[in-house]
Amino acid sequence: MIKKRNTTKISVIGAGSVGATTAYALMLSGVATEIVLVDVNKSKTEGEAMDLSHGADFVKPVNILSGDYKDTEGSDIVVITAGAAQKVGETRLQLINKNINIFKSIIPEVVKYNKDAILLVVSNPVDVLSYVTYKLSGFPKERVIGSGTVLDTSRLKHEIGKRYKIDPRNVNTYIMGEHGDSEIATWSVTNIQNIKIDEYANKENLEYNDNFRKEVYENVKNAAYEVINRKGATFYAIALAVTRIVKAILGDEKTILPVSTLVENYYGIKDVYLGMPCIVGGSGIEKALSIDLNKTEASKLVKSAETLKNTLNNASGL
């Protein structure tokens, strides 16, 4: 449990597009009194910290600095965004071997100075690297969290909200499983302010059929690729997703977010990190919720878990 105190320290490992934008989003949110950026590119990291610090007059008091792992000591949360960038046409799972080796150098250093911190993994493939972090750190599963499908779920809500012309925040649904190509949309539990989506669509004379579900799902699943094809990387939305998770932890909100967690017995799935609805609070992941899926969704989730397990089994250096 993160103890109540006057200062809150967050360290961000990796000062690339995602890391720097995450630091910016955290700065704007006002959740931290100190943000530390660490990256192998010292000059760029110093520049990012300087640039952010120059906005001090426009936000709550916050000390932003660049440094080494020693400077992260005593962090409440360590956000890990470091890793090889996803290239055009490259799936998240193809990144694994490159990023495992990077994590082998990062995690021991993070743990050395932050034995009580919560680790929030953002680097892709996030589910696999969350599992790798869990194993390398020796931390309890509650304190090793992946950003999971929080962003994918936001994309799904956005797609439905756009088509139905309603506030996406009124759409209750989840993307579960891998943050990537085998993720699943939980249509069976999707509702609009507690009205089942099929009932809502019927009452409002809106489209809701196999074609609708397929089109929406494909748009969500391929969203990152579409952004990467146009601008080279995704970083704004994921930075907001990370900030949302951080706020849930620091505020001990006990809110439900589909983060990546160690699944131990859910539809027969064991010993793998997957995006699951979890209660997130001051202790990190306080509980993973075993929501009831229909047979098709459950089968797809099992396959998603198998995909990730196969990747782990085939990865070099594990």
Curated annotation (Swiss-Prot):
GO terms for molecular function: L-lactate dehydrogenase activity. It holds the Pfam family Ldh_1_C. GO terms for biological process: glycolytic process; lactate metabolic process. Keywords: Cytoplasm, NAD, Oxidoreductase, Phosphoprotein. One of its GO terms (cellular component) is cytoplasm. Its EC number is 1.1.1.27. Pathway: Fermentation; pyruvate fermentation to lactate; (S)-lactate from pyruvate: step 1/1. It catalyses: (S)-lactate + NAD(+) = pyruvate + NADH + H(+). NAD(+) binds at V18, D39, K44, Y69, G83, A84, S105, V122, S123, N124, S147. Substrate binds at Q86, R92, N124, P125, V126, D127, D152, T153, S154, R155, T234. InterPro entries: L-lactate/malate_DH, L-lactate_DH, L-lactate_DH_AS, Lactate/malate_DH_C, Lactate/malate_DH_N, Lactate_DH/Glyco_Ohase_4_C, NAD(P)-bd_dom_sf. Belongs to the LDH/MDH superfamily. LDH family. Catalyzes the conversion of lactate to pyruvate. Homotetramer. HAMAP family: Lactate_dehydrog. This is L-lactate dehydrogenase. It comes from Clostridium botulinum (strain Langeland / NCTC 10281 / Type F). The lineage of its organism: Bacteria, Bacillati, Bacillota, Clostridia, Eubacteriales. The gene is ldh.
